[in-house]
Amino acid sequence: MPAIFRTRLSRPVCLALTIVCCTASPLFAMDLLQAYQLALQNDRQLRAAQAQHDAGIEALPQAASRLYPSLGWSSSRLSVQQDRRDGATQFPLQRYPSQSDTLSLRQPLYSPHLEALKLQAASTALSSSATLQGEQQNLAVRVTEAYLTVLLAREREALIKSQIHSAQSRLEAAQKQFTAGVGIRTDIEEIRAQLDVLLAQALQAAQSISAAQADLSMLTSQAVTNFFVLDGNSFQSDKLRLGQELAPWLEMVLQRNHEVRYRQAQRDAAQASLDAANTEDWPNVDAMAQISRNSGENAYFVNSDTKSRTLGVQLNVPLYQGGWFSSRKRQALANLRESQDLLERAQLLAQNDAQKAYFAVHEGLARVAALQNAAASAQLVVTANQKSYRAGVRTTLDILAAEQRAAQVALDLAEARVQCLIAWVRVKALVAQADENSLRTLSSHLTPSE
């Protein structure tokens, strides 16, 4: 193969090809990973968070700029008209031009207040980054929930359609038996009643699919009607196991959880704000340099031209501003206490959420295993009722009841698998690990639709 064809495609190119294929072919089935990649590009909530992050991190260069040299230029061109009277003496009306040009340079030499404001801005920028990371993690959860909701709705519709087909077949058989004089009218009416309920459920299932697909399309900005499907043969419990120890996850969530990191940055910003308030009344020292030129400064020096150069150090010492400094310190201290309490609350909530999601995965896997056995048993009951019907021991209604129980168990099994997958990605999101690799793992539990 020529070398040019072995060149690895960049990620944007691969994503563009994915979108083109998804748009061009109505038979294209979008998997969970592809849905997440599209959502990363198109989700409005994430894009708004990105813009908010870009704006938030500008606080640091803005604060740092106040510690750099500031250079300014001012210039004026004036036309002065002076009418002067000294007692009874009237002086002639004077008209003369006045010009002024000044170039000033100022460099802070000692300003602990500005240094504290810079540290506060750095913490604010970190909180913006934590917020953006949190939105990325939440997007993975939202896409997973939306995608699996579509699959579950389609699974429910397929089971209902299967029940409808079976009920219609049983209804035809019951009608033939009644016509032949060996059936009873009650069986026909009961089957029809069950069929009406199933038809209503089918309509509701179709509406649920449309709503779920609309929710997913809002995230991906891509209308797709073909999806992967839930398949018991593809569901791999071993890939979802989180280990037997909860403690490592609780420790990890304190270090990596986006909400905890955001609150830590906010606490650090509040501490820096307190430092800034404490140093606001400290002396400041600036180096100054100035070059100026003036002409026509007043009526006595109409034709004068003055040039001056100034170089020196300026000391500013705030003395009293009506209690401003004390109030600022009290306010900053209260804000620090608030941020510390919010940090501790975020840590407790993150650990609590991680514990819930962790046990949801473990309990979900156990429930899936139990429902798999229940589904196999329910199918055996259906087969046994069918054999008993042929032997004349069971009725058509018995078969329908067994099939309904089997369908309900199958639906419960599908719901258990979906809940287990969602709980798993929530655990990953809580420790900032809900990325493309995690979504790829989830996609391996699904099967392309035929």
Model-derived regions, located:
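A glycine-/polar-enriched beta->alpha junction
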Residues: 37-47, 54-69, 102-120, 130-137, ...
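Small/polar, glycine/serine/threonine/aspartate-rich low-complexity segments that form flexible
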Residues: 74-107, 231-242, 275, 288-328, ...
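Acidic, low-complexity, intrinsically disordered peripheral segments
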Residues: 6, 81, 412-450
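Amphipathic alpha-helical coiled-coil scaffold segments and their short linker/junction regions
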Residues: 39-40, 188, 222-290, 437-450
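Sec/Tat signal peptide C-region and signal peptidase I cleavage site
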Residues: 25-29
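Amphipathic alpha-helical coiled-coil segments
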Residues: 48-63, 135, 139-158, 169, ...
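Periplasmic alpha-helical coiled-coil/stalk elements that build and connect Gram-negative outer-membrane
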Residues: 3, 30, 138-252, 357-360, ...
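Bacterial N-terminal signal peptides
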Residues: 14-24
